[in-house]
C-alpha cells in the first residue's frame, strides 16, 4: 500500500512516520499517554492505496476529533494536524499571500482583487516587520471545530482553494482597521491571536477587502407609508444584507388591512403581503454567495391593527399565503400594554394611518395620545389585553418568537435627545435612533472573559480587562471611519452618533474556571464587576480618544448632563473599584466621542472559533453535537471532562450516561455533588437568577443585551411570570428567543439500551422531588400574577423561575 505525496509521487506507508508526526504535534497536551499510537492505528485502519497525504492528514484529524470525548486535548490535536496540513499548502510569507489575493483574476481574466490596494501597499511597505511579528504557532491553540469554522467561512479562497491562514486573516483584519498605524495594527493582531477578544463576523469577513463593510447591525424605520417608501426601504435592506449586515426594521407605521388609501381611492392589504416580499428578499440576498442567509427582524407595536396576523407569520400551520417563515418577529411593547394585561383590561387596536403619532411617542406622552384615541373611538377593534397577551405567548411557545422588548425602558435609559427609538436590531441588543434619513449602525466585538482568569491564584484580572476594553473601544471607533456603508443613510447616522457595541463570551467558562456556581453570590458579584469595569474603561477611552470634539449629537444627551447608565436605573454605584466621580468630571469637561458603548450580543460563530461558551449564557448541555463536512462529532464540556478525567471518573460508561441524560449530570450517581452543582445546565438554573443577573449588569449596559429565556416545558403561567418579572426589574430586552426542550427525547442509537432506560427512570423519579422544591419567592411571584393567567390555564403550574 502506498500514498501520493504533494508532488504526486508514490511513497510507501510508514506507521512510524505517522506516529512520529502525531507525537510531534502532541506537545504540551495533558496526559495523552499511549493515545498517539491509537490514533495512528485508527489512521492505518482507514487508509486505502493511493490516498493523498493531505487526505491522510484529514483522516488523522477526524480520528482525533472522534476521540475528543476521551479527552478534550484530542480536539486540540485534531486542530493541530489540520493546521499543519494547511501550513503545507499555504505560504508563510505575508507579502506573498497578499500578492496572490490582490492580483487575483476571475474566470474571464478580469481583475477581482480580494484585498484593497491600500492594504496591499501597506503589507508590501511593512513586509519585513509583519513577517517577523506574525506568529503561526498560535494556530495550534485552536480546537478542531474552531479551526473548521474558520476554514469553512472566514479564510479567503482562490478558486475554492484556501489561501489565508488564520493568522493572515487576523493580520488582514487588524491592518484594515489601523491602516495608518502599524503599531496599533500589530497590537490588535497579537491580542486577537492570543484570543483575548474577537471582532464580529462581518469585520472578519470584510476588513481589508475592497468593500470593507465591517458593521454587524443595521436598524431601519420605514421611509414612508407608501409604495415608494416601502420599496425604498426594501432596497436598503437588500443592499445591507448583501454585505453581511443583520437588519431590524420597524413596520408599525405601515397602515393595517382594510385601511383607506387616499391616493388611489383603494383599500390596503395590510402588513402580511408586504412582509412576504421582505421574506423573499431575505432568502434571495444571502450575504455573498451563500455565506449565510439574509436575516431580518421585523418590529411592531402591539396596538397595530394587524398584530394578530403578524403573530401567526412564522407558525408551521395555516395558509401559506399568510406565512413568512424566514423573517424573525419582534414586539416593541409599551408599559401601558403590560399594565392593561396585569389589570385584565381592554386593549384597542389602531391603524397608524388613522391614529398617527403613536410610534413617535413613549411613556406618559404615549399613554395620553393612546387614551385620547380610545376616548374618541378611533380604534379599529377592542380586545381583552390578555387575549392578545396569550396570542403572543402562544406564538413564543410554538416558534420561539416574537422577540420581546420594552419600548419605554429602551427610550428612557439610553438616549432621550434624538427622538423616539422605534426598534432594535436582529439580535435585540442594539438600541439606537432611526428615521427616514438615518439608518442606525453598530460595530461589534466580544471579549473572551475566560482569558482573564489566573488559574493558579483563582482570581479574575480586572486590570487586564480594563486595558483590553479600552483597545476594543478605540478599534470599533476607527471602524466607523474605515467602514464601507451600503446606504448613505447609514453613514449619516454612524458618523453623527458614533455608537459601538462591546460584548462578551465565555462568562460560564469563567465561572467554571474560578469554581463559582452560576447562581452563587460570588458569580453574581463577578458578573456586576465585569460590566462595571468594561463600562468605565469604554467611557474613559471615549473621553481620551476625543480628536475633534464630541460626537455631533452630544449636546442634550444624558452624558452631557452628567447622567450615566446606572443613574437612569436609579442604582447607587460607589467609587470602590473605579472613580466614577472623577470620570463624570472629565466627561463634563471634554464630552464623549461615542454615544453608546456596551451591547452584549450573541456570539454563536465567534465563540465557536475561540472555543468558549456563547455570550453570558450558561451551558445548555454538557454534551452536544458538532457538524462539519466530514460528519458529526460529540463534544463534551471541556471543563467537566477535565474534572472527570482527573478524578478517574471518565470512561465509556460515563459517556453513555451523559448522552442518555441529554448532557445533564444531575442524575448520574457516580458524579459527586460538588461537580453536579458546578456543572448545572441552563435548564437546571432558576430563570429568576438569570434575569436578576441580567438586571445587575444592565446598570452598566447603555444599549441592551441578547437575553434568551430557557423553559423546559413552557406554559402561559410560566411565561407570564417570567415576562412580568423581567419588566418590573427594568430590563430593556425581555426575551430574545424562548428556548424549549422537546417533549420527547430522540432515539439514541449510540446509547446502550439499559443505560437509556435507567436514565429515563431516574429522571421521572426525581421529577416529583424537583416539582416540590419550589422556592417561596417563586410561588409568591406566580400568585402575584395568577389573575392574568388563571382563566387560560387549567394546570396547577409551578413558576418557570425554578426551571423545573
UniProtKB/Swiss-Prot annotation:
Activity regulation annotation text: Under complex allosteric control mediated by deoxynucleoside triphosphates and ATP binding to separate specificity and activation sites on the large subunit. The type of nucleotide bound at the specificity site determines substrate preference. It seems probable that ATP makes the enzyme reduce CDP and UDP, dGTP favors ADP reduction and dTTP favors GDP reduction. Stimulated by ATP and inhibited by dATP binding to the activity site.
Residues at which GDP binds: 216, 425, 429, 603-606
Disulfide bonds: 217-442
Family statement: Belongs to the ribonucleoside diphosphate reductase large chain family.
An annotated GO cellular component: ribonucleoside-diphosphate reductase complex
Keyword tags: Allosteric enzyme, ATP-binding, Deoxyribonucleotide synthesis, Disulfide bond, Nucleotide-binding, Oxidoreductase
Residues involved in ATP binding: 5-6, 11-17, 53, 57
Catalysed reactions, as listed in the record: a 2'-deoxyribonucleoside 5'-diphosphate + [thioredoxin]-disulfide + H2O = a ribonucleoside 5'-diphosphate + [thioredoxin]-dithiol
Protein name per its UniProtKB record: Ribonucleoside-diphosphate reductase large subunit
Catalytic residues in the record: 425 (proton acceptor), 427 (cysteine radical intermediate), 429 (proton acceptor)
Record's function text: Provides the precursors necessary for DNA synthesis. Catalyzes the biosynthesis of deoxyribonucleotides from the corresponding ribonucleotides.
E.C. number: 1.17.4.1
Alphabetized InterPro entries for the sequence: ATP-cone_dom (IPR005144), NrdE_NrdA_C (IPR013346), RNR_lg_C (IPR000788), RNR_lsu_N (IPR013509), RNR_R1-su_N (IPR008926), Rrm1 (IPR039718)
Annotated site location: Important for hydrogen atom transfer: 217, 442
Alphabetized NCBIfam families for the sequence: NrdE_NrdA
Top EC class for this record: oxidoreductase
Subunit structure: Heterodimer of a large and a small subunit.
Every ATP-cone domain range: 1-92
Site (Important for electron transfer): 736-737
Gene Ontology molecular function: ATP binding; ribonucleoside-diphosphate reductase activity, thioredoxin disulfide as acceptor
